């Protein structure tokens, strides 16, 4: 969490995720995984001093956070970050995080269901954790990297 002034919110979500996994509560895991992604995005935007609407929907929030550290489609930095293959993987990570939001809307905590939900298994919980991990690690490692694209160009505009 290098460079994040107050990573406490991330640690809270990680602790809740761990407990929900231990308790075999896939709905709670899915909800917490989505919240971890949102929290990571907002913390990075705060660190970069980028304004955002706290009620911003997930897709624009993630895009804004990715753009703030140079992980957007239009980034033309020299080096490997410019490669189509790298950008394709980065886009995939963003899509994975969006899939997590959609899974949470259907099965996770945060929206009261009109009927009993069924079918979720531990494997779905683990999938949600891995989706959140992929996106959050990508964001946090890029944010803390001394050679990350955002350190060499003005991306706040």
Segments predicted by a language model, with ranges:
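Short, charged amphipathic alpha-helical segments flanked by flexible coils
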Residues: 49-93
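Charged alpha-helical initiation segments
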Residues: 1-29, 39, 43, 149-157
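Short acidic alpha-helical/loop segments enriched in Asp/Glu that coordinate divalent cations
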Residues: 29-32, 43-61, 149-151
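A structural signal for well-ordered alpha-helices, especially hydrophobic packing surfaces
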Residues: 14, 18-21, 40-44, 69, ...
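Charge-enriched, short contiguous segments at helix-coil
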Residues: 86-150
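Residue-level detector of well-ordered alpha-helical segments, enriched
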Residues: 9, 28-32, 40, 57, ...
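Short, charged/polar, low-complexity loop and linker segments
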Residues: 12-19, 79-85, 113
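Long amphipathic alpha-helical segments
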Residues: 5, 50, 77-80, 110, ...
């Amino acid at each position: 969490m290098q460079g994040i002034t107050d990573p406490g919110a991330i640690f809270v979500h990680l602790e809740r995720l761990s407990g929900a996994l231990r308790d075999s509560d896939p709905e709670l895991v899915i909800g917490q995984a989505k919240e971890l992604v949102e929290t990571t995005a907002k913390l990075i935007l705060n660190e970069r001093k980028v304004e955002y609407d706290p009620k911003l929907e997930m897709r624009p929030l993630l895009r804004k956070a990715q753009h703030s550290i140079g992980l957007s489609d239009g980034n033309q930095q020299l080096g490997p970050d410019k490669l189509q293959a790298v950008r394709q993987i980065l886009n995939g990570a963003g899509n994975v995080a969006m899939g997590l939001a959609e899974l949470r809307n259907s099965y996770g905590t945060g929206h009261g269901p009109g009927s009993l939900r069924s079918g979720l298994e531990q494997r779905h919980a683990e999938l949600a954790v891995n989706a959140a991990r992929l996106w959050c690690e990508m964001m946090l490692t890029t944010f803390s990297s001394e050679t990350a694209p955002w350190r060499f160009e003005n991306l706040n505009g």
